[in-house]
């Protein structure tokens, strides 16, 4: 006998729609509230999602760190290159 999966499908669709609305609400300053963050946290907990378990991609961070060093070498303490200073004068 095959199980009816319509309830599971419905609950997944409901959960997805709720998550999409929460994500949209994060972009709306008037809707961002402690209650919204609490609801998002409960949704993540329900799915056993923990931000602490996320590992940063070393390759991306390494690239950003390298780019920052290159930038610092090209600009002075004021954040301007020699060309920038010349065009501002």
UniProtKB/Swiss-Prot annotation:
Keyword check for DNA-binding: yes
The keyword Nuclease appears for this protein: no
Tree of life domain: Viruses
Domain notes: The N-terminus contains a helix-turn-helix (HTH) doamin that is involved in viral DNA binding.
Family per record: Belongs to the terminase small subunit family.
Subunit structure: Homooctamer. Interacts with the terminase large subunit gp19; the active complex is probably heterooligomeric.
Full protein name: Terminase, small subunit gp18
Organism: Escherichia phage T7 (Bacteriophage T7)
């Amino acid at each position: 006998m095959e199980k009816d999966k319509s309830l599971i499908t419905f609950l997944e669709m409901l959960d997805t729609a709720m998550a999409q609305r929460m994500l949209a609400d994060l972009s709306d300053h008037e809707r961002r509230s402690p209650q919204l963050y609490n609801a998002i946290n409960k949704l993540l907990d329900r799915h056993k999602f923990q931000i602490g378990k996320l590992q940063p991609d070393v390759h991306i961070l390494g690239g950003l760190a390298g780019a920052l060093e290159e930038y610092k070498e090209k600009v002075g303490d004021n954040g301007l290159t020699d060309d920038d200073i010349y065009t501002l004068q």
